[in-house]
């Protein structure tokens, strides 16, 4: 990115009282101009602490939604309105309600990589780093873990005393990594 563009971005940030948050996954040039770079949890946390009235989010839609949920009075703008995480849409409200009807005492545990609509229907939202600790401390035996089945199965493997119900959500990038490829790479 040339200096002229960088200077223009800095000028606009001051004029618009804006801060730029960028996920690790975005291009290096975008990370260079960002005020903060990190994972979705870190950026959500930073979003609650920045004084600027406008947050420009360089990441996928659920990240921007999370920033808005945590900062309802701030303006949150997505750098790319089409950036999305397919896994975030792999469960719907009807499925949550169906599971609640079948298991009246279920706790709906939602991985943060989900839409605002799904978060609103859930009992608790977790990250990959705190999912095990939070689920372990839930009083409910029945756990509906959404949308990421792989993270849910890892948590379930550590908590045999709980009964897990899974959604078939997944990250298409992560599920394309197979044991055989890892063994071959060794």
Identify what each model region corresponds to.
Residues 1-186:
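Active-site loop-to-helix "anion-binding N-cap" substructures in soluble metabolic enzymes
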């Amino acid at each position: 990115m040339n200096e002229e563009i960088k200077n223009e971005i800095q000028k606009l940030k001051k004029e618009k009282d804006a801060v730029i948050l960028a996920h690790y996954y975005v291009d290096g040039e975008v990370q260079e101009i960002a005020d903060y770079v990190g994972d979705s949890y870190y950026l959500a946390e930073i979003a609650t602490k920045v004084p600027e009235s406008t947050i420009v989010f360089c990441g996928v839609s659920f990240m921007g939604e999370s920033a808005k949920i945590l900062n309802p009075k701030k303006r949150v703008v997505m750098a790319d309105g089409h950036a999305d995480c397919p896994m975030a849409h792999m469960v719907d409200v009807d499925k949550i309600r169906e599971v609640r009807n079948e298991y009246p005492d279920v706790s709906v545990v939602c991985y943060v990589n989900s839409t605002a609509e799904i978060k609103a229907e859930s009992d608790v939202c977790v990250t990959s780093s705190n999912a095990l600790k939070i689920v372990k401390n839930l009083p409910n035996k029945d756990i509906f873990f959404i949308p990421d089945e792989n993270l849910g199965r890892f948590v379930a493997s550590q908590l045999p005393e709980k009964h897990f119900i899974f959604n078939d959500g997944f990250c298409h990038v992560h599920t394309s990594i197979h044991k055989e490829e890892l063994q071959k790479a060794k």
